[in-house]
C-alpha cells in the first residue's frame, strides 16, 4: 500500500496535470477528489467522532489530524463544488452512523417519560408554542414542565445557567423581523435550536424556538442553521458548496461581529436528505463555524 503522504503527492500532481492539459478535466478531477477522500479515511488522517456528554447529541464531527493532509485538501479542493464532492465521499467511506438517539423508541406513557423543564414568559402565544413542544418532547421520551420567567432574556438565562433544560423564545422578536435579539440570546447562552413551531397571532404567525444546551438531534431534521465569521468571498463559496451538496439556502444574514470589526454570517439551510456531508464540510473548511441548530418545524 502506498503511504498516505506519497498518495497525496500523486493525487495533487494528477490534479495539476488535469487542470492544464486533459479534456473533460471536471470528470477526471472528480475521480481524484474521491480517491483523496478514500486515502484520508483509510490512512486515519481523518477521524469521525460522535458528540458525547453535555451537548447536541446525534451528530458526529470530522477532524483532519495531519497538517500535511489538510494542506493537500486545501490545494485540491479550492472550489465549493470540489469541497462538497469531497465531503460527500468522506460521508460514504465512513461507516459510523450519524444518528444516535438516546431514546430511539417512542414512549406512550407519561410515567415512562423523563421530566425536563422549559423556561418561558407567560402569554397566550408562548403557551401555544409550549403545547406543541410538549407533544414533540413526549414523542421522544420527555415530559415537559414550564418555568415561568418575567422576560425573554430571563428565560434564555435559565436554560443557559441550568435552571431549566430548554427555553421557549420567539425568533421574530425584534424590529427587523427575526434577527438581532434572538441570535444574541442564543450566542450569549451557548444555546442551540432543538425545534421550532409557528404560532398563529392576530397579525399573522410568530415562530417560536425550543432551545437548549443539551438535546438529541432527530432523524426528521429539515433545517440546518449555522454562523461563521468570514468575508463575502468565502460566504459566496459556502453558498456554492451548499448548492452542490443538494441543499437549499433559505436565508442568509450578516451582522457585525462583536470585538472583531468583521462580519458574522448566519446561514439557514433547507436539508435534502441527511446533514452529515454539510457538517463535515464546515468542520474541515470552516472550523470556526458555530452550530445554531439542526431541527425540524413542527
Predicted segments, located by residue:
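Domain-level signature for soluble enzymes in the chorismate/prephenate branch of the shikimate pathway
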Residues: 1-298
Amino acid at each position: 500500500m502506498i503511504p498516505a503522504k506519497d498518495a497525496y503527492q500523486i493525487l495533487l500532481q494528477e490534479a495539476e496535470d488535469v487542470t492544464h492539459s486533459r479534456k473533460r478535466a471536471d470528470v477526471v478531477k472528480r475521480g481524484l477528489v474521491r480517491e483523496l477522500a478514500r486515502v484520508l479515511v483509510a490512512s486515519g488522517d481523518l477521524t469521525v467522532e460522535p458528540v458525547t456528554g453535555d451537548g447536541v447529541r446525534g451528530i458526529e464531527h470530522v477532524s483532519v489530524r495531519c497538517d500535511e493532509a489538510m494542506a493537500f485538501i486545501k490545494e485540491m479542493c479550492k472550489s465549493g463544488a470540489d469541497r462538497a464532492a469531497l465531503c460527500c465521499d468522506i460521508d460514504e467511506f465512513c461507516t459510523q452512523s450519524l444518528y444516535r438517539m438516546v431514546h430511539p423508541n417512542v414512549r406512550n406513557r407519561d410515567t415512562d417519560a423523563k421530566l425536563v423543564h422549559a423556561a418561558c414568559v407567560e402569554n397566550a402565544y408562548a403557551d401555544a408554542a409550549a403545547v406543541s413542544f410538549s407533544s414533540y418532547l413526549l414523542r421522544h421520551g420527555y415530559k415537559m414542565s414550564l418555568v415561568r420567567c418575567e422576560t425573554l432574556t430571563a428565560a434564555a438565562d435559565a436554560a443557559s445557567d441550568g435552571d431549566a433544560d430548554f427555553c421557549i423564545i420567539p425568533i421574530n422578536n425584534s424590529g427587523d423581523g427575526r434577527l438581532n435579539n434572538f441570535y444574541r440570546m442564543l450566542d450569549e447562552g451557548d444555546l442551540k435550536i432543538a425545534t421550532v413551531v409557528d404560532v398563529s397571532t392576530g397579525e399573522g404567525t410568530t415562530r417560536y424556538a425550543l432551545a437548549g444546551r443539551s438535546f438529541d438531534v432527530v432523524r426528521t431534521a429539515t433545517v440546518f442553521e449555522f454562523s461563521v465569521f468570514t468575508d463575502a468571498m468565502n460566504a459566496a463559496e459556502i453558498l456554492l458548496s451548499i448548492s452542490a451538496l443538494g441543499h437549499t439556502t433559505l436565508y442568509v444574514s450578516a451582522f457585525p461581529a462583536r470585538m472583531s470589526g468583521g462580519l458574522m454570517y448566519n446561514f439557514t439551510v433547507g436539508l435534502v436528505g441527511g446533514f452529515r456531508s454539510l457538517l463535515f464540510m464546515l468542520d474541515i473548511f470552516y472550523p470556526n463555524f458555530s452550530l445554531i441548530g439542526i431541527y425540524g418545524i413542527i
